[in-house]
């Protein structure tokens, strides 16, 4: 029972602080082309101007670059590697919370 607040803190830390999963990343379609006032500085062969949302490449905002057009999912960038690691940690924390809650409930009911 003592570990439950710690697990909740870790879970929310991963969700809110460490950033989004890889499937939330967008990719620029044209170098120098403007989308909603943001100039792309990455090249890509996948052009899809119908998807306007802008999501930062770097969760800390240090890079200042944006994926703005196409939802690309798993790509081999460092930000995706860190995001996959965060999601694995998050899934492990959720599983541990579930096991702890079930075991405590079983102990209380019996």
Curated annotation (Swiss-Prot):
Top-level taxonomic group: Eukaryota
Protein name in UniProt: Putative uncharacterized protein YJR020W
Naturally occurring in which organism (per UniProt): Saccharomyces cerevisiae (strain ATCC 204508 / S288c)
């Amino acid at each position: 029972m003592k570990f439950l607040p710690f697990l909740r803190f870790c879970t929310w830390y991963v969700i809110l602080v460490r950033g989004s999963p890889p499937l939330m990343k967008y990719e620029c379609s044209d170098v120098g082309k403007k989308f909603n006032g943001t100039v792309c500085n990455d090249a890509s062969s996948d052009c899809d101007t119908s998807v306007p949302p802008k999501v930062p490449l770097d969760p800390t905002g240090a890079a200042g670059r944006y994926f703005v057009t196409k939802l690309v999912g798993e790509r081999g960038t460092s930000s995706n590697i860190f995001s996959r690691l965060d999601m694995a940690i998050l899934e492990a924390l959720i599983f541990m919370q579930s096991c702890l809650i079930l075991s405590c409930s079983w102990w209380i009911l019996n």
